[in-house]
Amino acid sequence: MSAANELEEGRALRLDWDKLAKLGARGQRVVPVVLQHADSGDVLFVGYANDEALRETLARRQAVLWSTSRDELWHKGATSGDWLDLVEVRVNCEQNSLLYRVRPRTGGVCHTRGPDGRARARCYYRRVVSERELEFA
């Protein structure tokens, strides 16, 4: 299994404790964004937004994020067709993170695929069972 595939499909816990430090070191001015299904309350995934991504999200009424790996705007669904229509945006008490309450147009949300070959409905598809081990939820 490739390293990327092992990270996304494996059963070993390999948290990236340095993610936020790397963003800061590269001068990326972003805040975390929790994307939540507006009807079920399920957390779909966590992304990042800068001021431009938030502006585009509000204007388009669809989830737009900042891709920290590609250093560019990421209009969720533009490539995959898995659009996330915006219901509302909330900000936390310290104004250092956002909550996008969204409705997926299709069943798919995550860029990973389940055993059936379809995009997963959320990115939280494994649970932590120990300090080193995961299992599929």
Describe the predicted segments one by one.
Residues 2-30, 37-44, 49-137:
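C-terminal binding/interaction regions
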